[in-house]
């Protein structure tokens, strides 16, 4: 006795690969565009984080918050004291966690 055939789904492996490749191309172009738009503000932010005598406090909301959480986690795991604070929580008391010497990295779309 053999297993029944899988149900027909209309799945096309070749089409799935085409769509994946197209998605990667779109994302790669977006990253290249972002790299081209970096200016003095980016360099100033990097300099502030490098010179920070305290911690890097990352804030963001929505998708920017998800990215901010990842940035804070990456900084912390690579030796830079950092943590994430949701801006709504910051406005309701969590700003008290900031101390002199901290640098705030506010993520905005």
Annotated model-derived regions:
Residues 1-109:
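Conserved N-terminal alpha-helical segment that immediately precedes and caps sugar-phosphate-binding
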């Amino acid at each position: 006795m053999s297993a029944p055939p899988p149900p027909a789904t209309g799945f096309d492996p070749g089409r799935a690969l085409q769509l994946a490749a197209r998605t990667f191309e779109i994302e790669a172009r977006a990253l290249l565009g972002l790299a081209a738009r970096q200016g003095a503000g980016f360099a100033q932010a990097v300099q502030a984080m490098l010179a920070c005598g305290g911690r890097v406090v990352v804030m963001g909301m929505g998708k920017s918050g998800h990215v901010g959480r990842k940035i804070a986690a990456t900084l912390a795991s690579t030796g830079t004291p950092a943590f994430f604070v949701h801006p709504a929580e910051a406005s309701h008391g969590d700003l008290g966690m900031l101390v002199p010497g901290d640098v705030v990295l506010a993520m905005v779309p």
